[in-house]
């Protein structure tokens, strides 16, 4: 009887350890906690080329091989203002680990206002301009802020509508599972 008890206990412990070590489960749990909606089927993120604040053009392909947080925002959006500092802190913490943040401003013809905004909040990640909102339409953005998570393979991993605490422990764990 004692041998059976020890066997059952050992088996239970092994099952618990296996479940705890399941990275896919941890990935799903972090997505749920952050409010990330995964796609039904992973598909390549639509590529685009936009002007950056310094006048250069960048395309999404320029960031291939990195985990990307693609964020759509505007200077007039209150929740965007709330989340951008947290995105900067995330960028500073995880850039060396292959996480890139690309912020797409949908402000119309307000390049100087966007520049002033970026300076005010000391944002150092790439900011691109989509004044005609073609990229916004290609990504079906209905409200701001909206963010897409793109894996190192260039495929859409999920999207988030609304502001998030991007520098939270849960967020950092989520990006860690995406980069590995």
Set out the residue ranges of the language-model regions:
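Short pre-active-site segment immediately N-terminal to redox-active cysteine/selenocysteine motifs
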Residues: 66-68, 72-76, 143
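Thiol/disulfide oxidoreductase modules built on the thioredoxin-like
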Residues: 116-124, 130-177
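Bacterial N-terminal signal peptides
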Residues: 9-18
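A short beta-strand-turn-helix
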Residues: 42, 47-68
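Conserved redox-active cysteine motifs that mediate thiol-disulfide chemistry
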Residues: 72-89
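Thiol-based oxidoreductase modules, predominantly thioredoxin-like and allied folds used
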Residues: 98-111, 125-132
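Bacterial N-terminal signal peptides that target proteins for export
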Residues: 1-10
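N-proximal helix/coil linker or "cap" segments that precede and/or mark the start of modular domains
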Residues: 20-47
């Amino acid at each position: 009887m004692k041998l059976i008890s020890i066997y059952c206990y050992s088996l239970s412990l092994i099952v618990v350890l296996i479940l705890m070590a399941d990275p896919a489960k941890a990935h799903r749990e972090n997505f749920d906690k952050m409010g990330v909606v995964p796609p039904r089927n992973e598909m390549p993120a639509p590529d685009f080329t936009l002007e950056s604040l310094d006048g250069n053009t960048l395309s999404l392909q320029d960031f291939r091989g990195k985990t990307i947080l693609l964020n759509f925002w505007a200077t007039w959006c209150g929740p965007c203002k709330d989340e951008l500092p947290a995105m900067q802190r995330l960028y500073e913490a995880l850039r060396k680990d292959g996480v890139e943040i690309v912020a797409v401003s949908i402000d119309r013809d307000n390049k100087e206002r966007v520049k002033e905004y970026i300076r005010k909040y000391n944002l150092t990640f790439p900011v691109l301009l989509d004044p005609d909102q073609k990229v916004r339409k290609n990504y079906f953005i209905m409200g701001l802020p909206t963010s897409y998570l793109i894996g190192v393979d260039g495929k859409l991993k999920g999207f988030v509508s609304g502001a998030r605490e991007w520098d939270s422990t849960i967020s950092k764990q989520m990006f860690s599972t995406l980069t590995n």
